[in-house]
Structures are given as structure tokens and as C-alpha cells.
């Protein structure tokens, strides 16, 4: 089976146009591609036919008497020149066709919502109890809540002013905006969150992995929509290397150009890495604190799956992250991302959002995507099925925990009025062995 987008373009172009319309993209790409594809197939047929004639002439020339051989050789020489020119034309058209094919986003699953302007996601389910002020209750729907007289302090002020364990001012002076110094007990909390997520997921059969933090251009362009994200990722000056924006990129590339057999799948990985992001489109959003920053640590689930199993795995990895967040004691919701906001690689994406009581709103903490064969086609990762049928594998990714963002959620949901932050119980076993680490509570740092 060939690449699903290519199959759909050839066999059901109207469906692809519907997908592009749902994604709010230009549908004229379909007709442009079909024209190129038709031309490429016609030329390729001509090349194959001409090569067959050339091969026949070569065989005939080898057996022909000397007086006929010269004539045959001359014909073969003319055919070879024509064949060479035609092959160059085929290569040129093929490159144009391939470039255009790469510009197509993934197809979308039937359950992906097509939404009106101003709506980016549809809530699927809720977990936990949110703290909310009385005057904000009307904004909540299908949510279990408790009314509080006083809302907690926002995570940015809590981390920097009350606890004194984040310093964005000094980081801004020496590195620029959206950088930070993480200090004291929040450092241990960052480590504990990563170990908690890695341990839980490893127990579920995910293989721990730390990927390279940089990838070559020829590789990174295959794992993400490079034209869209060119300005969002960092390039190493003077090197053919880009910093990864998530462990997903490096893990996907781990099987670059791999040929698998059916019994090897699924392959489950849980990766940890720093993530480097320019946040070029963020503007003035979340300038305070460590919610939206240029570098952070993240645990990532990644699955290489048989095509028929990928939708089951999509639900599975989403539930894995739900469990991590639920067991931390953070109120959350799962939302189904609208077609226009999916991003090119995903056929469907869930976001898991956590309630921030100081802001009285849910904020994204994790994303879980089924990328189907969009990445594997570009990376050349195939599986040979029984009967020797070859297919592209499906790839899926899902945040385990992004540690700094999870810290911000803990600071708002677990703080007391005296400025003390309770450490979620599930994290305490990961802090117990470390003598210098906090165990039950994080106390404001005493000012001298």
C-alpha cells in the first residue's frame, strides 16, 4: 500500500479537497498535483516502453550478422540519447511532483470536528474538581467545581516573588526574554516530575530513550512541517544542524530508512529531552513566569504501530497522560482539536488542558497526535506484512509531562494561603532518596 495521501489524491481527489477546506487551506493544490502526477506517469510509461525497445535492440544486435549489426547499433544509439533526455525530464517532473506532495497535510479522521471561526477545540471529557470564584461559575459547563472565597496567587508571582525559586529578570539580562533560572526546590520538583512520568510509562512497556538534541536538515524536514516551523526552531549557525523542539523529532528519526517486519511492531518509546523553541508567534502572551519559554524539559511517548492498530494506540497514549495528570491531583479536561488547528502532520489530535485557578481557565499541558503515515512516508519507515506486502508504519506521539509547565500548574493548584506549596503525593517517592530535596512541602525561601 502506498502513502495514504497519494492514494487519496489519485482515487478520491474530492475528499482531499474537503480535507483542505476543513483545514482552511488552498484546494487548488489538488488539481496542480493531479496534473503533475498524470504527466509524470505518462512520461514514465514512455521511458519504460522505450527502455524495453532498447533492450530488445541490444539483444537483437548481439545475435545479428555483421552487416545488420551496424544498423542496429545506430538505432540503439539514437534510442539511448532519446531515453537519456526523457529520463531527465521524468526526474525533473518527479522532483516537482514530490515537492508538491510533501506540501500536503495529513488526511483527517472522521471524528475530527470542523469548527466555526473562534472555536479551536471541542471538550471530550473532564477530570477532577476545579477551584473557582463565585462570579466565574457561569463560565463552566459539565465541570465539577468548588467555590473559593480567595483565588490563589498566579504561578509566575508564586514562583518568583513568593517562593523566590525562579529568576526571569537575571535570565532576561544574560539571555533574553522567555529564559529563566530555576532554583532550589523547584529544581528537584522538575527532576521528580520527569522521573515520575518516565517510571510510570516504562512500567507500561515503553522503552526509555534520550534522543540527540540536534538533527540534520535532511532529517528534521521529514519529521515536521518544516515550511511552517522554519521560524519556530533554532538552527546552529555554520552547521547543518537544528535543535529539536521535542523528543518526538529525535525518536521518529531513530527508525529513519528502517525496514521492519510485522512481528516487531508496535515499538513503544518514552523519551526525555530538553525542548528548544523560538516561540516566534507567541508575541506578548505569557511573558511572565515559566509557562511559555524557549527551553524546557519534556517526557514524550512515541509509538511505531501497524496501520490497523494506530487509532487504538491514540486512545491508549492519551489515557496514559490523563492518568499521570489525574494522579498528580490536577483538574483537567481532554479536548478534540478542530481540523483547522491540527497542524499538517496530525490526522487527529487531543490536547489535555489543566485548570489554572488564578486565571480561571484551562491551559494546554499535553498534546497527543496520530500522525498515521505522514512521517513514516517521509522517513522511509516501512513494515513488510505477511505475504510480503509492504506498508508505511503509523507513528503517534503524546506528551508524557512537560515539567516546567506542570510545575506552574502545581503552584496554582497546590498552594496554601501562607505561601507553602504541597508536593503531590505521587512525586514524593522520587524525592525521598535525595537528602537535599523537599519531601512533602515547598516553603518560601527566606529572604536575608
Curated annotation (Swiss-Prot):
Keywords: Aminoacyl-tRNA synthetase, ATP-binding, Cytoplasm, Ligase, Nucleotide-binding, Protein biosynthesis. Pfam families: Seryl_tRNA_N, tRNA-synt_2b. GO terms for cellular component: cytoplasm. One of its GO terms (molecular function) is serine-tRNA ligase activity. It is found in: Cytoplasm. Coiled coil: none annotated. Its EC number is 6.1.1.11. L-serine binds at residues 246-248, 300, 399. Pathway: Aminoacyl-tRNA biosynthesis; selenocysteinyl-tRNA(Sec) biosynthesis; L-seryl-tRNA(Sec) from L-serine and tRNA(Sec): step 1/1. ATP binds at residues 277-279, 293, 364-367. GO terms for biological process: selenocysteine biosynthetic process; seryl-tRNA aminoacylation. Catalyzes the attachment of serine to tRNA(Ser). Is also able to aminoacylate tRNA(Sec) with serine, to form the misacylated tRNA L-seryl-tRNA(Sec), which will be further converted into selenocysteinyl-tRNA(Sec). Homodimer. The tRNA molecule binds across the dimer. HAMAP family: Ser_tRNA_synth_type1. Belongs to the class-II aminoacyl-tRNA synthetase family. Type-1 seryl-tRNA synthetase subfamily. Consists of two distinct domains, a catalytic core and a N-terminal extension that is involved in tRNA binding. This is Serine--tRNA ligase. It comes from Pyrobaculum islandicum (strain DSM 4184 / JCM 9189 / GEO3). The gene is serS.
Amino acid at each position: 500500500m502506498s502513502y495514504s495521501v497519494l492514494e487519496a489524491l489519485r482515487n478520491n481527489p474530492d475528499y482531499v479537497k474537503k480535507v483542505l477546506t476543513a483545514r482552511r487551506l488552498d484546494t487548488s493544490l489538488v488539481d496542480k498535483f493531479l496534473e503533475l502526477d498524470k504527466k509524470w506517469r505518462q512520461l514514465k510509461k514512455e521511458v519504460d516502453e522505450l527502455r524495453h525497445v532498447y533492450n530488445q535492440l541490444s539483444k537483437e544486435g548481439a545475435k545479428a550478422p555483421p552487416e545488420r549489426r551496424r544498423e542496429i547499433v545506430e538505432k540503439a544509439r539514437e534510442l539511448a540519447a532519446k531515453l537519456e533526455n526523457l529520463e531527465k525530464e521524468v526526474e525533473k517532473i518527479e522532483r516537482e511532483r514530490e515537492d508538491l506532495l510533501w506540501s500536503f497535510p495529513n488526511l483527517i479522521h472522521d471524528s475530527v470536528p470542523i469548527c466555526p471561526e473562534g472555536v479551536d477545540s471541542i471538550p471530550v471529557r473532564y477530570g477532577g474538581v476545579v477551584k473557582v470564584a463565585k462570579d466565574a461559575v457561569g463560565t463552566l459547563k459539565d465541570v465539577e467545581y468548588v467555590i473559593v472565597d480567595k483565588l490563589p496567587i498566579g504561578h509566575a508571582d508564586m514562583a518568583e516573588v513568593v517562593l523566590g525559586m525562579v529568576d526571569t529578570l537575571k535570565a532576561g539580562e544574560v539571555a533574553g526574554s522567555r529564559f529563566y533560572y530555576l532554583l532550589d526546590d523547584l529544581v528537584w520538583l522538575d527532576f521528580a516530575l520527569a522521573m515520575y512520568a518516565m517510571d510510570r510509562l516504562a512500567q507500561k512497556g515503553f522503552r526509555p530513550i534520550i534522543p540527540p538534541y540536534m538533527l540534520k536538515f535532511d532529517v528534521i524536514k521529514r519529521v515536521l512541517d518544516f515550511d511552517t516551523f522554519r521560524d519556530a526552531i533554532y538552527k546552529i549557525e555554520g552547521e547543518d544542524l537544528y535543535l529539536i523542539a521535542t523528543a518526538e523529532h529525535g525518536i521518529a528519526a531513530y527508525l529513519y530508512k528502517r525496514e521492519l517486519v510485522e512481528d516487531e511492531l508496535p515499538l513503544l518509546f518514552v523519551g526525555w529531552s530538553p525542548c528548544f523553541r523560538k516561540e516566534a508567534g507567541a508575541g506578548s502572551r505569557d511573558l511572565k513566569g515559566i509557562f511559555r519559554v524557549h527551553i524546557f524539559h519534556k517526557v514524550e511517548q512515541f509509538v511505531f504501530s501497524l496501520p490497523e492498530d494506530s487509532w487504538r494506540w491514540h486512545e491508549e497514549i492519551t489515557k496514559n497522560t490523563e492518568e499521570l495528570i489525574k494522579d498528580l491531583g490536577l483538574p483537567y479536561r481532554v479536548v478534540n482539536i478542530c481540523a483547522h488547528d491540527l497542524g499538517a502532520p496530525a490526522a487527529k489530535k487531543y490536547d489535555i488542558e489543566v485548570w489554572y485557578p488564578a486565571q480561571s481557565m484551562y491551559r494546554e499541558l499535553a498534546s497527543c497526535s496520530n500522525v498515521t503515515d505522514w512521517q513514516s512516508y517521509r522517513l522511509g519507515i516501512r513494515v513488510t506484512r505477511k505475504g510480503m506486502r509492504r506498508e508505511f508504519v503509523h507513528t503517534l506521539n503524546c506528551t508524557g509531562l512537560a515539567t516546567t509547565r506542570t510545575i506552574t500548574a502545581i503552584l496554582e493548584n497546590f498552594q496554601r494561603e501562607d505561601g507553602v506549596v504541597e508536593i503531590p503525593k505521587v512525586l514524593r517517592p522520587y524525592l525521598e532518596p535525595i537528602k537535599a530535596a523537599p519531601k512533602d512541602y515547598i516553603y518560601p525561601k527566606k529572604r536575608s
